[in-house]
A protein has these predicted regions:
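Extracellular/periplasmic bilobal clamshell ligand-binding domains
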Residues: 330-365
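A bilobed periplasmic-binding-protein/Venus flytrap-type ligand-binding module shared by bacterial periplasmic
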Residues: 170-177, 213-215, 285-300, 316-319
Length: 365
């Protein structure tokens, strides 16, 4: 195991320690791989590598024999419930959903595996958490003919997860308080004194900040946002839904980076005066699906993954979600989207978390 692998594994170990609120932790990736790796069962490996002209028929027959699957998901409860219901209607296979935030899903998957409890079949989460499962050797490499239809950023080389949708980090603003001609085109535009006292930011936006840093360079990024904080101040709040709601209500005028989904939902469902614009460097993040190495219902799990890469892709836009399928062409055009690199983020997450806190430590609260 090389130094970069150890660095990535130690980052995951620290994250899992934080999530489980442990007092002390053995850096798990310094242990022999046999201690931390969960070996796939024969049926899981067979389901994951199923191929041939009759793959669909064999997969469906074995999936129906299993009759159900267990899903840990981070997608919104309403959205994942609709997708699961459509899957159940089409195939007659029950989907048991446990929905939580990405940190909780990762914590449960890791904790159960280390305790020898194997209940989950499919984990649906953000790229960072899925890459963490890869490092922990809890996810099974999968072979699905539908992977080739996803954008390149949704296809990690190791094949231990596959992306099915994208989240956009966007500049959100109250459309009654900000004129269109005021909107920034790049983050450097936020140095303008017109933004003094008008900006808010998420208190833990590490994946966004890391990717901006990758695009602009570390030194330039730290200097730029340090100056924005010094000149104009930034209110720090916890939670992307909260930030979108605060912009909609006018309690804050604008948000440096939040998810497009929450803004679109407020505007669509409540006719709220909130909108968004992509600001350079514009950041996008992939979310996806992983198959547990000890999935109790591996064929049903693979059938569900196939469904999420096909039928579900056509359903996502109506839910204000962005499919990862090339054929859907759902990413807003005319924008040079910089995708979060989950593998690199896992290796550098501790560093960029520290830098983020340093830059925004003096922000107005």
């Amino acid at each position: 195991m090389d130094d970069m692998d150890i660095s990535a594994c130690n980052a995951v170990a620290r994250l899992c320690c934080k999530l489980t609120q442990c007092v002390a932790v053995t850096i798990i990736c310094l242990l022999p791989p046999s201690v931390i790796a969960i070996e796939a069962s024969g049926e899981v490996a067979a389901a994951a590598e199923l191929a041939g002209p009759d793959r669909s028929e064999r997969l469906l027959a074995k999936a129906r024999a299993e009759g159900k699957l267990n899903l840990y998901a981070t997608m919104g409860q309403e959205q994942i419930s609709v997708l699961a219901a459509e899957f159940e209607k089409k195939y007659g296979i029950k989907v048991n959903i446990w929905r939580a935030n990405s940190e909780s899903v990762l914590r449960r998957a890791v904790t159960e595996a280390k305790g020898g409890r194997f209940e989950v079949d499919v984990i649906e989460s953000n790229g960072f958490e899925l890459e963490s499962l890869h490092i922990e050797q809890l996810a099974q490499p999968i072979n699905t003919p539908h992977a080739v239809h996803m954008i390149a950023e949704a296809q990690p080389v190791h094949r231990e997860w596959i992306g099915n949708r994208a989240n956009l980090f966007v500049f959100a603003y109250n459309s009654q308080k900000v004129n269109r001609d005021e909107l920034p085109k790049s983050y450097a535009d936020l140095l303008d004194p017109r933004w003094k006292g008008r900006l808010a930011a998420e208190s833990d936006n590490i994946d966004w900040f890391f990717t901006v840093g990758q695009a602009l360079g570390e030194e330039r990024t730290l200097k730029l946002f340090g100056e924005i904080v010094r000149i104009n101040g930034v209110q720090m709040r916890k939670g992307h839904p909260l930030l979108a709601s605060l912009a909609a209500s006018g309690e804050v005028t604008a948000v440096t980076a939040t998810y497009n989904y929450f803004v679109d939902k407020l505007r669509k469902e409540k006719s709220a005066p909130v909108a968004w614009v992509a600001v350079a460097p514009a950041v996008a993040r992939i979310s996806g699906l992983a198959l547990s190495r000890r999935a109790p219902h591996p064929y049903a799990a693979m059938l569900f993954i196939d469904f999420m890469l096909t039928d579900a892709q056509r359903m996502l836009p109506s839910m204000d979600l962005i499919p990862a399928s090339r054929s859907e062409k759902a990413l807003p055009a005319g924008v040079d989207w910089k995708f979060v690199n989950p593998a690199e983020l896992v290796k550098q997450s501790e560093k960029w978390s520290r830098l983020y806190q340093q830059v925004f430590a003096g922000a107005a609260r």
